[in-house]
């Protein structure tokens, strides 16, 4: 078939990065339409992509007859309306997290997709495509480590925008460890407890940073996560598996190591997620494009190759429990419907 024609909605930092990725590194696709609530930004991005045009209304962009599939990099509060429009138009969509900003609307999206009988929504949990995470998953599934027991995780950022608040550390940062836990362990998460250590004096006023998250699965596996988003250093993500027959670590800084001033050594730390997970994003998008093109060519009922709407709903449910725990200081049980109760979820 000819190249997949994609509309990218939202061309801020992440969306613009995806436009560049789709236009230069991903095979079998072209960016046909872009949209952003800052229209001058959309026009600037479109001008750099041959044949790309701006559509001012996001719902019109989704319905455009020259668009085969959609990438959502818009603000989270707009996702539910835009996802439902994609379902109405039966257009495959890669939605950056969150699926939606609350549990009820996320569940509604899952149910609406299931009613169609076609899997159209993929959620952008890119770590599943990172070569290190993928390798660890393969080794776990092959039984190389015996029984997995514990995950120790670190999630650090150099700084956050002025609009950031304490709950966003759960909803925007911890959400990735939530998906990693479910991906590696093939289990839902049963409970979350957010601890509040001594705040970083350098954090913006009113932000509880760092935070420690403790998550437990129904089988008793333990996950602890250090969340520290104002380190002033760089972007650091690490995951250590502790298991019956050994341990494994993801995210060690094993690039170039420089020895300079006598008695010191060091290397580079990724400045942000685009650098650390650039390869993961490339793999994610190439596989998504291939899945959508295959679905269109064959009339398949599945246009995804990665995290589904259910995974987005599960993450929303865990993060809601995390926000409740942050406020109350106690462990909170994760409340979810049974997946089996939704035929096709």
Curated annotation (Swiss-Prot):
Per the record, the similarity remark reads:
Belongs to the Gfo/Idh/MocA family.
Q: How is the subunit organization of this protein annotated in UniProt?
A: Homotetramer.
Assigned EC number: 1.1.1.18
- Any one Pfam family match given in the protein's UniProt record, by short name: GFO_IDH_MocA_C3
Broadest EC class assigned to this enzyme: oxidoreductase
The superkingdom listed in its UniProt entry is: Bacteria
- Keyword annotations from UniProtKB, A to Z: NAD, Oxidoreductase
Task: Identify the species of origin.
Answer: Mycolicibacterium smegmatis (strain ATCC 700084 / mc(2)155) (Mycobacterium smegmatis)
The gene behind this protein is iolG
Q: Which GO terms describe its molecular function?
A: inositol 2-dehydrogenase (NAD+) activity; nucleotide binding
Put simply, this protein is called: Inositol 2-dehydrogenase
Reactions listed under catalytic activity: myo-inositol + NAD(+) = scyllo-inosose + NADH + H(+)
Role description = Involved in the oxidation of myo-inositol (MI) to 2-keto-myo-inositol (2KMI or 2-inosose).
Q: List the disulfide bonds.
A: none
Give the GO biological process terms. inositol catabolic process
